[in-house]
């Protein structure tokens, strides 16, 4: 494929370059034509997509359609209820944040970054630090085979957002920075739409904080500042890793 493409395309303004993992190992051979991924790539399909890119195409069906769970379906399945209860500060008469941290500690859940640091202990340490506290979400996936986050975000973005916001609420983060791999162009659009839908649902009162008494109206949910940032070519370009 790599040898045939330059001959097939035959254009000076098109460069064919071998690249390390682009987060699509389950779709090999995978090609990235501009911002458009081509799964199970053939020379003819890559040439077709490349021609579209050169022609200024804004969208291309370079892979099978993805079934993304949108906000109405997520809300209907109980989505954002945990976030609302945590934002209330109490769960079953107990401090919601402390209860969740104890649950994580008891479960023995560990991070997947290599060190295997216990998640509950990390949340407790961060929660005990002086404010302001910030959260950096690293979605770069620079190692071969690590396409799990992309697959998950494509299909269930609101579950990711709720988990992120639950963690931010428990530890008291004032702002969240989502660092997303630059090659994940379609996933960036999915997250942008999901964030816009979430903010609108909060503004409309569809997601609110339950009150302690049945006769008291729900109060608005206050979201932290959330910024979606494009990656810069490697996971070590993220602010979290840069500070380390």
Q: Which positions does each model-derived feature cover?
A:
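Feature of Fe-S/electron-transfer and energy-metabolism proteins
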Residues: 1-244
